[in-house]
């Protein structure tokens, strides 16, 4: 190889790394720019996503469910969910803790072992079913030009304003407090929407219900067609159950009972085991014998109930009214018992026994049947509220206030109108704007003490009195008599049937659908 060719080859080899380095340097610069741009976008996206996630954006801007043609955000679902929970809590009170663990997450507690459904699932279903009903009725209201009254709008504003007190106590503003109570993404805006739609639906439904009216002829025709639905019976009842025959025996030995050893001194109770067939035979024998021996002899029935009762219950049965069931409606009884008691051929003193599906025997003594054709009382009252009626100091203050109000009434013209004015000024009840008036009070509608005063047979218009209940102290005024109890029962039944027909036509099957992505942002 010549010297010149060798020289050229070395030049070519030397040039290769330079070209490669130049190419490498060129790719690195472009790639870096691209990577930086991509990373920047990703970082921004991540920051924005987490901001949207933590700020509640998704909870207020995505769709979690669709009801009656309305898309509900996760925040709106939260309101109905919380309402479903609160409704059950109000229904069961302190017993709620026996149904579920109120201190543990609901989505970790099984409601239905067969389906795996959790309590969170249950309340979600209840809430969305209610939401479907609410929006359907609200749409119907709007379609018919129905709007909230000024009073209802003011009530919504008052409810929102009241949140400020709780928010301030927790060092929060209104929005943050609503979010803390109902879940991330919940705000005054969405909560106001929830209050407006639920108030509108409730108000419109009430207006529809109260709008149904019936003539005397229609009421009379309904009663004649279905008297059992509106009459009431009075009877006596004694229950014969397994417990009457399952006695306990002391299995400890007398010699060991005197022992100083605690492990042997304690006696243990064992229950005499009877077969199901033996128990059934014993129960039927007692029930049939009691029914046969006490027919047309009410005192004999009372005595037999006392004799057959367990020793632990004899004190209760010593009260002759313990077995007495007065003015019972057909709808309040089991079908077998009701059918016998309401049989048109029934006469005073008739007896029978009926076994239910649980093996309990009802021994029955028929006394009378009422057509409930008597007038219902109209009563005004002024409530002096006492939060804790066991607080004697507070009760004494309430009694003094009640005496003062009654004295002021007696010093005036003693009219219903003047009592009503005093009620508006002094009552702690919600009906103050009506002058404390309750019309057509149904038997058992009020607490016992209040009810007994209203239905006292000696009661006359203008009567006054003071009654103490679990709510505090009531200044009472008997305003007179209203409608027939029977007619009221009939009218209520007709109204319920008509309202249910209207409701079903508007609401349908309460259908709803959920959106899995949106439901992820609900708070449970």
Language-model features: where?
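Sec/Tat-exported extracytoplasmic proteins
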Residues: 81-84, 88, 131, 135, ...
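Surface-exposed intrinsically disordered loops and tails
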Residues: 102-113, 314-322, 326-335, 339-344, ...
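PPIase-associated folding chaperone regions across multiple families
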Residues: 8, 12-60, 177-280, 328-400, ...
